[in-house]
């Protein structure tokens, strides 16, 4: 089955499940004022240690993050959550996670460059503006992945 076919098959069940969670939590997925954030975890019938990839904070976007900051009265929390969501999405969904310890993690590279620029050592030293900048840079890195993969496919076809 292709990806589009699978999405069409499960979409009604996903939408129904989200509606149930919204009713239980009293929040709405995608709502700017009272956002519902969900976590998505891969699963298998048989336990596979090390294979439980998770994406947290699904539901955050440029508008919802502002509402989350207002709702929690914690702008730092909201922007750091958004940063983490984009990073996990890149790692888990787009395969940007390094395959070995020698490989460079593109998100860590971006964060380390900003730490160097700001002359700080710890993630906790990032300002709210730094976190906003990281979100922008992470989104830029994530949007480049499909272009990179397309170029790789073209190169492989030419080489064949």
Question: What is the meaning of each model-derived region?
Answer:
Residues 1-160:
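N-terminal beta-alpha lobe that positions the nucleotide/phosphoryl donor
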């Amino acid at each position: 089955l292709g990806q589009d076919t699978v999405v069409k098959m499960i979409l009604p069940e996903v939408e129904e499940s989200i509606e149930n969670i919204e009713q239980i939590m009293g929040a709405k997925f995608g709502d700017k004022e009272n956002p519902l954030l969900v976590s998505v975890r891969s699963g298998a019938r048989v336990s596979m240690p090390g294979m439980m990839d998770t994406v947290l904070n699904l539901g955050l976007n440029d508008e919802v993050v502002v509402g989350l900051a207002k709702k929690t009265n914690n702008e730092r929390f909201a922007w750091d959550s958004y940063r983490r969501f984009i990073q996990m999405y890149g790692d888990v969904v787009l395969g940007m996670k390094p395959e070995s310890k020698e490989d460079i993690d593109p998100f860590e590279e971006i964060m380390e460059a900003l730490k160097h620029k700001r002359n700080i050592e710890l993630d906790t030293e990032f300002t709210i503006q730094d976190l906003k900048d990281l979100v922008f840079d992470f989104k830029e890195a994530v949007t480049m992945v499909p272009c990179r993969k397309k170029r790789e496919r073209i190169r492989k076809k030419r080489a064949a």
